[in-house]
């Protein structure tokens, strides 16, 4: 099967479907025919750390994956923050500390651990993700074996 490559869309198209793409108004104007070896190399998994781009000559090429933008780093930090909060809440809920505290049954080491975990949650809430990737994440309390 023969393929064409479009630098504009950074995509391959089967040449035998040109009529269908043309009728749909989606056949690229910059289509260049590529041999099977080029198609196989650039339609599969990219080498580690690379992405497919449109080369200067209109053919596909490999390029380094660009570093994440600041906005992407912030989004990743927000996700991590929420995951850490969820993990802490799950752990605390598994111990039923809130219920025990409400009825006065939380004492001693359990009370101390509960307060450490509440402090940890407070510290997580205060994390400013806008400074990503330079974030000092709070350390969770040591988990006490029971």
Swiss-Prot record:
Top-rank lineage group of the source organism: Bacteria
GO BP field: response to oxidative stress
Any Pfam family hit: Caudo_TAP
Family: To E.coli YmfS.
PANTHER family per the UniProt record, alphabetical: CYTOPLASMIC PROTEIN (PTHR34413:SF1), PROPHAGE TAIL FIBER ASSEMBLY PROTEIN HOMOLOG TFAE-RELATED-RELATED (PTHR34413)
Annotated protein name in UniProt: Uncharacterized protein YfdK
Organism of this sequence: Escherichia coli (strain K12)
